[in-house]
Each structure stands twice: as C-alpha cells, then as structure tokens.
C-alpha cells in the first residue's frame, strides 16, 4: 500500500511517500511545497491545492495520512494553518482517496517512543527507519514521512476504508 503523509502548513507543506509491503516499509519520496511570503494568501492556498493534486497524481497513493491541528499560541497562525489544511483536505476529497489523521503526539510517540520529541529527533529516526543516506530535509518533509510511517505501522486495515465520494 502506498501512503502519502502530509504535514500541513501555509509557508511550507511537507510531504512524504512510503510503500508498505507486508511488514516492510520502503521509502519512495519526500519534499516540500513552499509558498512565497509576499504572495496574497488566497494565491498561496491555490498553489498548495494545485501542488497537492500534482503530488497525488504523481505518486498515486492508496491512503493519505495528515497531521491534525494542534494548539497554537498564535491564533492567526492557527487560522492560516487551518485554512491550508482545508484546501489539502479538499484536494484529497476530490482525488477520492481515504485519509486518516494523527496528532503530533501520536506521530512522535510512534516514531521515537517519546511524544514530545524534537524535530531533529524525528529527522534522525526517519533516516534510520527508511534507510536513507541523508537526514530528510526540510524538517516538514521529515515530519510528513513520520506521519506516513505512523499510518503504515498503526495496524489498521485501511483497505476497508470507504473512499471519499465526489
């Protein structure tokens, strides 16, 4: 099963793709969608939406795993991330692919064994788990790989998930 992990944001959206074959999880790809600070916010959202669609089309995942929103001290940041997450979920919906959500705590606990792990720890662990030559960068992409990994090892049978309907 091919799984696309997404770490939502409005400045940088991380993505990571893994393939689960039996009990093995193989690395496929990772990267980041970066938006320009000076652009109008609606243009940034449009760009994120289009890029997520392209990633879905390119990697053809059977499942998307996305990080759920967590508490932000800055309300404005939380709203922006929530809006970016909304267009990402819309792209997933239009692609007719099932998705699952994980909290940052769940992902960190699953990947490192510690629910409050630092981003650098996530990067190092993902390098080891996926047998990569280098630490995955940016850290948003490493987080996305960790989200995909979390879906792959969670033990759920996602093949029985009902696909989104258009």
From Swiss-Prot:
Mg(2+) 2 binds at residue 67. The active site is at 7, 67, 140. One of its GO terms (molecular function) is magnesium ion binding. GO terms for cellular component: cytoplasm; Holliday junction resolvase complex. GO terms for biological process: DNA recombination; DNA repair. Mg(2+) 1 binds at residues 7, 140. Keywords: Cytoplasm, DNA damage, DNA recombination, DNA repair, DNA-binding, Endonuclease, Hydrolase, Magnesium, Metal-binding, Nuclease. Its cofactor is Mg(2+). This is Crossover junction endodeoxyribonuclease RuvC. It comes from Fervidobacterium nodosum (strain ATCC 35602 / DSM 5306 / Rt17-B1). The gene is ruvC.
